[in-house]
Amino acid sequence: MIVPGMEEILKHTATLPTSTPTVGPIPTVTPGDWPVVQHIHDTGKRTLWVVAVLMAISSIAFYSLAARVRVQTRLLHTLTALITTVSFLSYLAMATGEGVTYKHSVVHHPHKHVPDTHQEYLREIFWVRYLNWIITTPLILINIALLGGLNGANLLVAIAADLIMFAAGLTATFTHDERRWVWYTIVIISFLTIGFQVGINGARSVRRDADQHRTLFTSFAGANLLVFLLYPIILAASPLSQRISVDAETVAWAIHDILTQGLFGYWLLLGHDSSETGQLYVDGFWSQGISHEGAIRVGETDGA
């Protein structure tokens, strides 16, 4: 039964505006119960094998080039071959699953209207890569110093800064809190020190050399420093801030190593061997060994 007059009221109130909720749905934020595992996939694994093969081929090529020249002019060839040999061994280890560990980190995610959350990450780290650099990059710096006639004092500072740079980078990689950026600052300072010793002092040492030799040193040293600049960039983007995947990191490091340890080695040796002036000639112990001529033996008696 309809109350008299109610039907007329319903007709007029049906078109009146109604209130709507002013507060939207509160987002649901669920803390990460399981850690996010960041590891290498097929792209990264194939990259490791490709670089290992390239470094093996380059090592054979460099040893062959070394055998074709006199021992007095073979020092650069030997150092370059050792660089690719160490790189081959390190990439072979990584390709077969050796020299790897996982870094555990916890990332804090702040929120405005709900409690903050934390997410655990497990990222695959190839520590043998740092061992590769600690051995090979001083040899690269020695090649640059020999090519440009850099003195021993400047070379020693450059090598020390190089070792500090990679040791600080390794420490920053496994540091869990904001202190990793302190170690990263040490990486930057070390890189600038290398750039000054090799770039500025090296340019001064070849200022009076022939144009061909000066051009070879300037371009070779400059190209190496430019590629070395990728190290702090990739380091910040991959293990420190985890902005890129492990596969992308692997490809980036592969490009870095192929250039500095492989292609630049061909550039150095071919440019050095074709140069009419400024070829490195090392005699003495390197080519002749220790001479015993004129040595006096103390303590021996005549007729003994």
What residues fall within each predicted segment?
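Fungal extracellular Ser/Thr-rich, low-complexity intrinsically disordered regions
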Residues: 1-41, 298
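Juxtamembrane membrane-interface segments at transmembrane-helix boundaries in membrane proteins
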Residues: 30-44, 112-128, 247, 252
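First transmembrane helix
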Residues: 44-69, 88-91, 95
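Alpha-helical transmembrane segments in multipass membrane proteins, preferentially the mid-helix core
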Residues: 60-62, 168-172, 190-211, 226, ...
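Internal transmembrane alpha-helix with an interfacial aromatic "cap," most often the third helix
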Residues: 61-65, 115-174
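Helix-loop junctions on the outward
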Residues: 90-125
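Membrane-helix boundary/juxtamembrane motif in polytopic membrane proteins
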Residues: 181-184, 202-226, 246-250
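C-terminal transmembrane-bundle signature of multipass membrane proteins
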Residues: 219-304
